[in-house]
C-alpha cells in the first residue's frame, strides 16, 4: 500500500508540473511583444518629431524622421498595412516640400548662415593687425631704425656678393685657359708617347739612322747604303733583336720635327683651307705626313740594297715585312687621322728630291716602285697635285670623296697579299693611308648622312606633328565623351530632383490607397488630403490636367464629410483655381476662386456667431478671423489676374486669328486675281478673230526661246574638236567635222534671228488689231 501511495503522489506531482509549464508564457512571444511595443512607440515618436521639424521648417530632418518611421512600420506590418498609411502620407508630404525647396529659385539661399559670427571673426582678425594711429612716436622711431639696419645689411650682402662673383669669373677664365691647354696637350700626347717609346731603343740605332739619312740626301751612294744596311743588321744580330722600322721612323720623325719647316707649313695649310675639319684632325694629318717622309727616306736604303746585290732578296723581303708590320703596329696604337690629300702631298714632296723613288697612291691602288735608281717616272703625280690644288682653292669635296672610294676598297686587302705581290715598302704608305681611310670614310659618311639626318629630323617632326594632331583628335574625341558625361551627370541631378517628386507621388499614392480602403471618416479625410497633395505634385511637375483631376477628387470627398464653411474646402477651391489658371482655363479659375471666397466668408460668419454664443475669451476667434481677412485680398488678386489674363488671352486669340486670316488671304488672292485676268484675256481672243489664237501661240513660242548659256557648251565642244587633230596629229576628218559643227551653229543663229524678226512683226500686227477693236 505504501508503494502505491508513493507512485500516485509522484504521478500527481508530474501532472502539476506539466500544468505549470503549460501556463508559463513562451519567452519568444514575450520578446516579440516587447519588440512590437518598442516599434510602435518609436514610430510614434518619429512621426511627432517629423511633424515638429515640418512646422519649424527643417524639411530634410522631417524627411529623415518620416522615412525612418515608415521603414519601421513597413518592416513590422507590411507596406500596405493600415498602420503605415499615416507614415507614408507625412513622408510624401515632406518630400513634396523638399522638392519645392530644391526647385524654388527665390528661396532663402543664406538660410542657416550666421552672418554675425563672420563679422565677429573679421573684427578679431582686424584686432590682430596693429593700427598706425595707435602707435607712438617712440615706437615709430624704433621701427625706422630697424628698417634702416635691415636695408644696410642687404646692401652689405650685395657688395659681398659682387666681390665674390669677381674671383669666380676669374676662376672660370682660368679654367677655360686650362681646358684649352689640356686640349693642346691632348693633341701633342701621341707625339710625346711616340718619343717616349722610341727613346730607350733609338739611342742604340742613332749611328745607323744618321748614316742612312746622309746616304739618302746627297745622291744615295750604293756602297754607303749597303754598309749602313750591314751595320744595322749586325747590331740587330748582336742584341738578338730584329730590326723594327718603327723605331727608326720614330727617331727620324723626331729629327724631322726639329728641322722641317716645310712640314709645319704643310700642317698650317689644311687648317686654313679646311675650316670644317677640327684642329685635332689637321695636326694628326701633319703627323701622318711626317711618317710618309720618313718612309720615303728609308725606301732608298732598301732599294739600294736591292741594287747593290750584297744582300739576297729574301733578307730584303724579311726586312720589308718587318718594317711594314712594325709600322702597322705603331699606327694601330695611335689615334691618327689621315686624308688622301695629305698622302698625295707627301708623295709629291718625295718625288721632288733627287735620287729617291717616287711612291704615289693612285686611284686604282698602290704602284710598285721600280728597283732602278736612275730613271724614275711617277705614275700619276699630276693627278695628286691637281687634287691638292683643288682642295687648297676651297673646291668641293665631292671629287675627293669619289677618289677615296678605291682607296677605301684597298683597305680590305690583307698585308700578306701585298707583300707576296712584291709591293715592298711602297705598300706600307698605302696601308697607312688605307688604314686611316675608314676613319675618313666615317667622316665622309657623316657628312653625307647630315642631309639624311635632316630629312629624318623633318620626317620625325612631321610624325610628331601628326602624333600631336592625332592627340588633338583624340582629345577632341574625348571632349565629346566628357560632354556626354557632363550631360549624364546633369540628367542624373535632374533625375534626383525629379526623383523627390516621383518618390513623393509614390508615397502619397500608397497612402491614398491605404486610406480609401478604410471606411472611417478620418481615413476618408486623409484620403482627400492625399488627393490634394497629389494634385500639388502634379502642379510642380506641370501636369495640370492630372492636378485638376486630383483636386476634384479631393473636393468630392471633402464635400461628403466636411461642413460648407470648413477651411479645407476653401483651400481645395483655391488650389483648383490655380490649376485651372495654369491650364489657361480662366473662367473655371475665376469660378473656383469665387467659391473659395464664399467658403471663407461663411467661416467668418460662423465664427462671429460662435463669439456671440461663447461666454469666455474671444481671442481665438478673433485671431482666426484676422487670418481669414488677410487671405481674402490675395484670393481677390488672383481673381483679377485671371480676368486680366482672360482678356489678354482673348485679345491674343483675336490677333492670332487675324494674322492667320491675313496670311491665308495673302496666300490665295494673287493667284485668284491672276486666274481671273488670264480667263478674261483668254475669252477676248476667242470672241475676236482667229488671228488672236496665232498671236497667243507665237507668245508661247517666244517665252521658250533659247538662252545663250545653252550655246556655250556647243561652242566649247567645237573648239575642242578643232584642237584635238592639231595636238594629237589626227587626220583632216576631225577638222571637217569641226567646220560642219560651226556651220550648223551659224545656221541656227540665223534661224533664231529670222524667228525673232517674224515674232516682232506678228506682235506689231496684233497690237494694231487690238487697238482697232
UniProtKB/Swiss-Prot annotation:
Region called Histone-binding, residue ranges: 116-127, 210-242, 455-498
SUPFAM superfamilies associated with the record: TPR-like
Organism superkingdom: Eukaryota
Gene3D superfamilies: Tetratricopeptide repeat domain
Modified residues (N-acetylalanine): 2
Region (Disordered), start-end ranges: 115-244, 258-284, 301-321, 349-493, 683-773
Database matches in Pfam families: SHNi-TPR, TPR_8
UniProt modified residues of type Phosphoserine: 127, 175, 188, 242, 304, 319, 384, 395-396, 466, 483, 489, 648, 691-692, 712, 731, 737, 742
Motif Nuclear localization signal boundaries: 702-708
Matches recorded under InterPro entries: NASP-like, Tetratricopeptide_SHNi-TPR_dom, TPR-like_helical_dom_sf, TPR_rpt
Stated family: Belongs to the NASP family.
Protein name: Nuclear autoantigenic sperm protein
Organism, as annotated: Mus musculus
Amino acid at each position: 500500500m505504501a508503494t502505491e501511495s508513493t507512485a500516485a503522489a509522484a504521478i500527481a506531482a508530474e501532472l502539476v508540473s506539466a500544468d505549470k509549464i503549460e501556463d508559463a508564457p513562451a519567452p519568444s512571444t514575450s520578446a516579440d511583444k516587447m519588440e512590437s511595443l518598442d516599434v510602435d512607440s518609436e514610430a510614434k515618436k518619429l512621426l511627432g518629431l517629423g511633424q515638429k521639424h515640418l512646422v519649424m521648417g527643417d524639411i530634410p530632418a522631417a524627411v529623415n524622421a518620416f522615412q525612418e518611421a515608415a521603414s519601421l512600420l513597413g518592416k513590422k506590418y507590411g507596406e500596405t498595412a493600415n498602420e503605415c498609411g499615416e507614415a507614408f502620407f507625412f513622408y510624401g508630404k515632406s518630400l513634396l516640400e523638399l522638392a519645392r525647396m530644391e526647385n524654388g529659385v527665390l528661396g532663402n539661399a543664406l538660410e542657416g548662415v550666421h552672418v554675425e559670427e563672420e563679422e565677429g571673426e573679421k573684427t578679431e582678425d582686424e584686432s590682430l593687425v596693429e593700427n598706425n594711429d595707435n602707435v607712438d612716436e617712440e615706437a615709430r622711431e624704433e621701427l625706422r631704425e630697424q628698417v634702416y639696419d635691415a636695408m644696410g645689411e642687404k646692401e652689405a650682402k650685395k657688395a659681398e656678393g659682387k666681390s665674390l662673383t669677381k674671383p669666380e669669373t676669374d676662376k672660370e677664365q682660368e679654367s677655360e685657359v686650362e681646358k684649352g691647354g689640356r686640349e693642346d696637350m691632348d693633341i701633342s700626347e701621341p707625339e710625346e708617347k711616340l718619343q717616349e717609346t722610341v727613346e730607350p731603343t733609338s739611342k742604340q740605332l742613332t749611328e745607323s739612322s744618321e748614316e742612312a739619312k746622309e746616304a739618302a740626301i746627297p745622291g744615295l751612294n750604293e756602297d754607303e747604303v749597303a754598309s749602313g744596311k750591314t751595320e744595322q743588321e749586325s747590331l740587330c744580330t748582336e742584341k738578338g733583336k730584329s730590326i723594327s722600322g718603327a723605331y727608326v721612323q720614330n727617331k727620324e720623325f723626331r729629327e724631322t720635327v726639329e728641322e722641317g719647316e716645310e712640314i709645319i707649313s704643310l700642317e698650317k695649310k689644311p687648317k686654313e683651307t679646311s675650316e670644317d675639319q677640327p684642329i685635332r684632325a689637321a695636326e694628326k694629318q701633319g703627323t701622318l705626313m711626317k711618317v710618309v717622309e720618313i718612309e720615303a727616306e728609308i725606301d732608298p736604303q732598301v732599294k739600294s740594297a736591292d741594287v747593290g746585290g750584297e744582300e739576297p732578296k729574301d733578307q730584303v723581303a724579311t726586312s720589308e715585312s718587318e718594317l711594314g708590320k712594325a709600322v702597322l703596329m705603331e699606327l694601330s696604337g695611335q689615334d691618327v687621322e689621315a686624308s688622301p690629300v695629305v698622302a698625295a702631298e707627301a708623295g709629291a714632296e718625295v718625288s721632288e728630291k733627287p735620287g729617291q723613288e717616287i711612291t704615289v697612291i693612285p686611284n686604282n691602288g698602290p704602284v710598285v716602285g721600280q728597283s732602278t735608281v736612275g730613271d724614275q717616272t711617277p705614275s700619276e703625280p699630276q693627278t695628286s697635285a691637281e687634287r691638292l690644288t683643288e682642295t687648297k682653292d676651297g673646291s668641293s669635296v665631292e671629287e675627293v670623296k669619289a677618289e677615296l672610294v678605291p682607296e677605301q676598297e684597298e683597305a680590305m686587302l690583307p698585308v700578306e697579299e701585298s707583300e707576296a705581290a712584291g709591293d715592298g715598302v711602297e705598300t706600307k704608305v698605302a696601308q697607312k693611308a688605307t688604314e686611316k681611310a675608314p676613319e675618313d670614310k666615317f667622316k665622309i659618311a657623316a657628312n653625307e648622312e647630315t642631309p639624311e639626318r635632316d630629312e629624318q629630323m623633318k620626317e620625325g617632326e612631321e610624325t610628331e606633328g601628326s602624333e600631336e594632331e592625332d592627340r588633338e583628335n583624340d582629345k577632341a574625341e574625348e571632349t565629346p565623351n566628357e560632354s556626354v558625361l557632363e550631360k549624364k551627370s546633369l540628367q542624373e541631378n535632374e533625375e534626383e530632383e525629379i526623383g523627390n517628386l516621383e518618390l513623393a507621388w509614390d508615397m502619397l499614392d500608397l497612402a491614398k490607397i491605404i486610406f480609401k480602403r478604410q471606411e472611417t471618416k478620418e481615413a476618408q479625410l486623409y484620403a482627400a488630403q492625399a488627393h490634394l497633395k497629389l494634385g500639388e505634385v502634379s502642379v510642380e511637375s506641370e501636369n495640370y490636367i492630372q492636378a485638376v483631376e486630383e483636386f476634384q477628387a479631393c473636393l468630392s470627398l471633402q464635400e461628403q464629410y466636411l461642413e460648407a464653411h470648413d477651411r479645407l474646402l476653401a483651400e481645395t477651391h483655391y488650389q483648383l483655381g490655380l490649376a485651372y489658371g495654369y491650364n489657361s482655363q480662366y473662367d473655371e479659375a475665376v469660378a473656383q476662386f469665387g467659391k473659395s471666397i464664399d467658403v471663407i466668408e461663411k467661416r467668418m460668419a460662423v465664427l462671429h456667431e460662435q463669439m456671440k454664443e461663447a461666454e469666455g475669451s474671444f481671442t481665438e476667434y478673433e485671431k482666426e478671423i484676422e487670418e481669414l481677412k488677410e487671405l481674402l485680398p490675395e484670393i481677390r488678386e488672383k481673381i483679377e489676374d485671371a480676368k486680366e489674363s482672360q482678356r489678354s488671352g482673348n485679345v491674343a486669340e483675336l490677333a492670332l486669328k487675324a494674322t492667320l486670316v491675313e496670311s491665308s488671304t495673302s496666300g490665295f488672292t494673287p493667284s485668284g486675281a491672276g486666274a481671273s485676268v488670264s480667263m478674261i484675256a483668254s475669252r477676248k481672243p476667242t470672241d475676236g478673230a482667229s488671228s488672236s489664237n496665232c498671236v497667243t501661240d507665237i507668245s508661247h513660242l517666244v517665252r521658250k526661246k533659247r538662252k545663250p548659256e545653252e550655246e556655250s557648251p556647243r561652242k566649247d565642244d567645237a573648239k575642242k574638236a578643232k584642237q584635238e587633230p592639231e595636238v594629237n596629229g589626227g587626220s583632216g576628218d576631225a577638222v571637217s567635222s569641226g567646220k560642219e559643227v560651226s556651220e550648223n551653229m551659224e545656221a541656227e543663229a540665223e534661224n533664231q534671228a529670222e524667228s525673232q524678226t517674224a515674232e516682232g512683226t506678228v506682235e506689231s500686227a496684233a497690237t494694231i488689231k487690238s487697238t482697232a477693236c
